[in-house]
Amino acid sequence: MVNLIRERLKAWEHSEYPGATRTTTELLAYWQDEGREKRLFYAQLEAAKTIIFLTEARQDLLQGIAVPRDDPSADRKESGYSGFLRYACKMATGAGKTTVMGMLTAWSILNKVASRGDKRFSDVVVAVCPNVTIRDRLTELQPERGEASIYRTRDLVPERLMPQLAQGRVLVTN
């Protein structure tokens, strides 16, 4: 399935992202701008684009790609719990996982703010950490940190979109 996703992702890119929202195409262009002072790593761009592709690509490009839902047990379903999609990006130490988290957080929040009724996006993001040290480090994902947030320190969001990003919430917990 991984090779099929890579192949379709390339086709999606070459076709200028059919199915993507205006917000998404703006962010993708911003992240890939050759004139960026703070260039993003190839692995960071590919990880973010893959998740975005799986969420927004036109249906014909997703044909044959079925990511299974993470469904709860039968007794949990009876209690009202529902399944969700869980995506994973395998990245090496030092490859910029926090930056990818910031890219995807900004993408989701900004799309939700632009289109409140679109259920593909959320303006609330929860980051669950394995320990206090990582939890403290990931507070840079919180938009209310403004210029100290990852969105400005790593130039993930154009300054003019920061007020919209501030309408979202990022909860970091362990």
Predicted regions and their residues:
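RecA-like P-loop NTPase motor core of helicase/translocase proteins
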Residues: M1-N174
